A protein has these predicted regions:
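A glycine- and charged-residue-rich anion-binding loop/surface
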Residues: 1-722
């Protein structure tokens, strides 16, 4: 049976048994920005299992895209060297949310594998948790598995938990005996040894979530037990197609054939070089699906894992004699073979191929120098690669640490990882020092919590979302040379965050005025800094009554910040959903937006982006701001930055039908208040990162007038018409 048929038969079977077939969720988890990638079928249902979300059905079935590379679940190191490890795979699963439990789940699994799939029941083993008498009895009495093929195992193999606390429970696994010669009953130890050796293959895991583990480790029965099952599609295909490796199934054969065509050597699994073929085939699938789901190669987070996968593939192609882009052609084969099941691969083909080729070319430009340096470092029979040298391979030649470790292991070497981390931290320290030097206020301790004279115990309240002018009191002050810092009880001044610059303005007291030139964070509060005109009280003991006024330029900043959200949405619409923010500057006089993209925008793309933003402005959409639970906001489609630390409750800036982002900045009440938007430049700032600068409102109008004046002047000199 072909892989596509195995997938469809699974979904059809469970649909016939009352399950709602749901689409795979994205590889980028919607409800959990701290999780690198979707790595199991249950990820999209996590909040359903926790009772926090209702999806309108209590039975579901899916074929879920999964990636295990980076983080807790990381199969990257094993890919190509074993018969079953993959970075990208599909997980078939059926789920019960408080509906059926062990009896039906076990019966469904048995009927599908022995009936519709036609697997030999005499070759099937079942395992249960040593404490799960109920499951053991169901396998033995209800299904009829003999005791010699039913094993009780411990927590490591047969107990599952979502986290240290919360829903958990025993699991039961189905295994298939792939041996040609079977010699009789097995002991538990023999079974485990054969399973670890790949001769007996796990094909399905049934998790019975029946307990809630508290923070003391105690288990309490759940009021509505659930079922979460997972069967690796590729592993199941290997069993049903009678092959000894997932790479020899019909879903990988076209990819291995493409690699063989590119390197001009047939694939021979007996040769050591065959590892490279398998790595290229696997990594091409991971790259294609990650790019299609909006992940973009970068230097951190998900993007860095993708870059590591790409560069591992380039290195294997290089060892196979390919010194030109190779993975891009295998990605193209992935699109051809899997595009029917996943149409996004086809619609985003150009982006997938362009990005893959660009990343390959970038690493190929430095790989030779890096390989030569590595050869010098690992010229003996064994030894250690110094940490500072591993860092140079990373920083100068683009070799991820795990790639250097892999190369070292192949030579019998180790890498001084601690030394690498020290060199990396030193670079970060220098970067922080450079940033501090460029911010003299911070360098002088403007963010230091010491030295403040506290006049009021009342905590500060930020009122800057609603008010630009407020009468309030000074709750603390600090004199630092010729500068004075004030912490106001009610503070209208925005402190630089999320790309938006700090406010300026003034604070007036009885006979004195402070001109605000800098705003900083001091603990959880905000301080305004500046020079004082007049006589600031020498030794106040009670809160000083003042009037704080934010400069009118805040209105321009507000326009630019809302325009930045419109720009982000327009770039994603025109260039693709791989576009994500890499940095921004929101100032009164301009806005700057850095984003992930491979190459320069065409003039047509720039014009289209401008048009989309201006149409949104002229439509005068309301800008809605509310606070929600983080998971609810992300589930509703709000854009969140991976790696950003968000609280349980987040601030959502929503322009209905146009944009929804998590954002703490200040915004216009409606898009119409922006007035006008104009792109003024577009350039590259780093590998795979583009930058656009733009103007809004009066600034955009004045820019256009200046351009027209310059054009008219040039036409006059040339005695022609513009």
């Amino acid at each position: 049976m072909k892989t596509v048929e195995i997938r469809q038969q699974f979904l059809d079977f469970f649909e016939e048994h009352g399950h709602t077939v749901l689409p795979s969720s994205s590889l980028v988890p919607a409800d959990d920005p701290t999780l690198l990638f979707t790595n199991a079928g249950m990820v999209q249902f996590k909040r359903v299992f926790l009772g926090e979300k209702d999806i309108g059905t209590n039975r579901a079935a899916t074929s879920q895209k999964c990636v295990r590379a980076g983080g807790k679940h990381n199969d990257l190191e094993e890919v190509g060297r074993t018969a079953r490890h993959l970075t990208f795979f599909e997980m078939l699963g059926n789920f019960s949310f408080g509906d059926y439990f062990k009896k039906d789940a076990i019966r469904f699994a048995w009927d599908l594998v022995t009936g519709r799939y036609g697997l030999d029941p005499e070759r099937i083993f079942a395992t249960v948790h040593h404490s799960d008498d109920e499951a053991a009895e169901l396998w033995a009495d209800d299904v009829g598995i003999p005791t010699e093929r039913l094993f009780r195992l411990g927590d490591k193999d047969n107990f599952w938990q979502m986290a240290d606390t919360g829903p958990c429970g025993p699991c039961s696994e189905l295994h298939y005996d792939m041996r040609e010669e079977r010699t009789g009953p097995l002991t538990v130890d023999e079974f485990v040894e054969l399973a670890e050796g790949g001769e007996i293959v796990e094909i399905w895991n049934l998790v019975f979530m029946q307990y809630d583990r508290d923070d003391q480790g105690e288990l309490h029965p759940l009021p509505a037990p659930c079922v979460d099952t997972g069967a690796g599609l590729e592993r199941l295909a290997a069993v049903m197609q009678g092959v000894d490796s997932v790479f020899h199934t019909d879903c990988f054969r076209p990819l291995l054939d493409r690699v063989a065509e590119l390197v001009d050597q047939p694939y021979d699994p007996k040769l050591e070089a065959s590892v490279g073929y398998r790595v290229l085939a696997d990594h091409a699938r991971a790259v294609a699906f990650l790019l299609a789901d909006g992940v973009f190669p970068s230097s951190d987070g998900r993007g860095y894992v993708l870059r590591r996968i790409l560069r591992r593939a380039v290195r294997h192609a290089y060892l196979l004699g390919r010194h030109e882009p190779t993975l891009v052609d295998v990605v193209d084969a992935v699109i051809d073979t899997m595009g029917d099941a996943y149409p996004d691969l086809v619609t985003r083909r150009e982006h997938l191929l362009t990005t893959t080729r660009a990343e390959e070319e970038r690493f190929l430009a430095t790989i030779e120098g890096g390989m030569e340096r590595f050869e010098e470092l690992a010229s003996g029979e064994s030894g250690t690669i110094p940490g500072d040298e591993a860092f140079k391979l990373y920083d100068t030649f683009g070799f991820p640490l795990d790639l250097t470790e892999l190369m070292a292991e192949e030579r019998g070497y180790t890498v001084d990882v601690e030394g690498f981390e020290h060199a990396l931290e030193e670079q970060r320290r220098r970067s922080r020092a450079d940033r501090a030097a460029s911010q003299p206020g911070l360098e002088r301790g403007a963010d230091d919590e010491e030295g403040w004279v506290v006049l009021s115990p009342v905590a500060q309240d930020f009122v800057g979302y609603e008010l630009l002018q407020v009468k309030t009191g000074v709750r603390a002050f600090k004199v630092d040379g010729d500068r004075v810092g004030l912490r106001l009880r009610q503070n209208p001044f925005y402190v630089e965050s999320g790309g938006q610059v700090s406010d300026t303005g003034g604070v007036s007291g009885n006979g004195w005025k402070l001109t605000v030139s800098e705003v900083t964070k001091v603990g959880n509060e905000t301080a305004v800094w500046g020079t004082v005109e007049g006589a600031f009280p020498a030794d106040p003991t009670e809160p000083l009554e003042v009037e704080a006024r934010v400069a009118a330029t805040r209105r321009d900043t507000v326009r630019n910040h809302t325009a930045t959200h419109l720009l982000h949405a327009a770039l994603r619409e025109v260039l693709g959903e791989h576009v994500v923010q890499r940095g921004s500057l929101v100032a009164p006089d301009r806005l700057r937006f850095d984003f992930a993209h491979t190459g320069p925008m065409t003039s047509e793309e720039r014009t289209r982006v401008e048009q989309i933003v201006n149409e949104a402005i002229w439509a005068d959409h309301p800008v809605e701001i509310d606070h929600r639970a983080h998971a609810d906001a992300v589930s509703a489609g709000a854009m969140a930055l991976f790696g950003e630390k968000y609280g349980d409750e987040v601030r959502v800036v929503n322009i209905p039908g146009v944009s929804m982002e998590l954002c703490g900045g200040t915004h216009a009440r409606s898009t119409g208040r922006i007035g006008l938007f104009r792109l003024v430049s577009e350039s590259g700032v780093a590998a795979g990162v583009r930058r656009v600068e733009a103007l809004t409102g009066r600034g955009a109008f004045e820019y256009m007038v200046a351009k027209e004046d310059a054009l008219a002047e040039a036409a006059s000199v040339l005695r022609t018409t513009p």
